[in-house]
């Protein structure tokens, strides 16, 4: 089954083989790349998946999305052309042994975070601090018994750089790709000051979360579970032991797929 993670800035695709219970990461497409030239990059990837997996018409897919409406329209139309029916998953108050910490408005928790919580609970099976460093840095506390204790949302590295570029006259044009990552240091020019400041903000948030975890988990052991493209670098800057899972969200989608087929 095709698994889809439609994020803020790119969509990621994976394949779940129900016979072997293996998840294979297929790739990712930045949204800007396919919106600029309609949906050709997306269609190319989907056609490759359909042909290589020998999918039949009316094949099912399952996904979650925090993407913009325009992106979702492109995704849905491209998938429909190939006869792929997508079951988009929503956040629930309780599912697969996990209880949503957003008790007043559970649906306000992003479905990407919810899928990661489901995947973490199934994979880790103990207290976990989940650090997902993508477009935004999200941090969630999850008890071994499945209780979600809440979390934080922090602007990611590129969002911080963009905010400075938009809000000031002379600080435009810095991207994550420009940054040389050698750990924290005092900036000796404006460029270094900005990039090191972003690094300090992100690692500082994670460090505070780790410190709070002792209280939230009643001084019981916990794992630091890391996902997202920037996560491993940030953790190494902090010199903290962690477990990395590139497919955490897809593991959550796989659990939902099990329910579709049951």
Swiss-Prot record:
Catalytic machinery residues: 112 (proton acceptor)
Pfam families associated with the record: Pan_kinase
Keyword ATP-binding tagged: yes
Entry EC number(s): 2.7.1.33
One of the GO BP terms on file: coenzyme A biosynthetic process
Residues engaged in binding ATP: 5-12, 135
GO molecular function per UniProt: ATP binding; metal ion binding; pantothenate kinase activity
Keyword Cytoplasm appears in the UniProt entry: yes
Cofactor(s) for this UniProt protein: NH4(+); K(+)
Protein residues bound to substrate: 102, 110-113, 190
Gene3D superfamilies: 3.30.420.40
Cofactor annotation comment: A monovalent cation. Ammonium or potassium.
Catalytic activity: (R)-pantothenate + ATP = (R)-4'-phosphopantothenate + ADP + H(+)
Entry's Gene Ontology cellular component terms: cytoplasm
NCBIfam families, per database record: baf
Subunit structure: Homodimer.
Annotated family: Belongs to the type III pantothenate kinase family.
General function of this protein: Catalyzes the phosphorylation of pantothenate (Pan), the first step in CoA biosynthesis.
Name of the protein this chain belongs to: Type III pantothenate kinase
Organism: Idiomarina loihiensis (strain ATCC BAA-735 / DSM 15497 / L2-TR)
Lineage: Bacteria, Pseudomonadati, Pseudomonadota, Gammaproteobacteria, Alteromonadales
């Amino acid at each position: 089954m095709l698994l889809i993670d439609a994020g803020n800035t790119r969509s990621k695709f994976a394949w779940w083989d129900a016979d072997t219970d293996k998840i294979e990461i297929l790739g990712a497409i930045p949204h800007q790349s396919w919106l600029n030239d309609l949906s050709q990059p997306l269609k190319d990837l989907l056609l490759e998946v359909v042909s290589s997996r020998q999918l039949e018409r009316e094949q099912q897919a399952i996904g979650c999305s925090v993407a913009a409406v325009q992106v979702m329209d492109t995704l849905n139309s491209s998938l429909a052309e190939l006869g792929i029916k997508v079951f988009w998953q929503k956040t629930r108050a309780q599912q697969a042994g996990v209880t949503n910490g957003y008790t007043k408005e559970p649906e306000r928790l992003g479905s990407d975070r919810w899928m990661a919580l489901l995947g973490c609970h199934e994979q880790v099976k103990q207290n976990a601090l989940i650090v997902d460093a993508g477009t935004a840095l999200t941090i969630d506390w999850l008890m071994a018994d499945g209780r979600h204790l809440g979390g934080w949302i922090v602007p990611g590295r590129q969002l911080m750089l963009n905010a400075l570029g938009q809000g000031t006259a002379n600080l435009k044009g810095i991207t994550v790709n420009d940054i040389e990552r050698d750990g924290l240091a005092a900036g000796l020019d404006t460029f270094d000051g900005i990039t090191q400041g972003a690094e300090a903000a992100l690692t500082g948030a994670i460090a505070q979360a780790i410190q709070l975890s002792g209280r939230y988990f009643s001084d019981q052991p916990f794992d630091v579970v890391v996902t997202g493209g920037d996560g491993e670098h940030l953790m190494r800057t902090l010199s903290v032991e962690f477990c990395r899972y590139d497919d955490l969200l897809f593991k959550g989608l796989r659990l939902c797929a099990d329910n579709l087929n049951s």
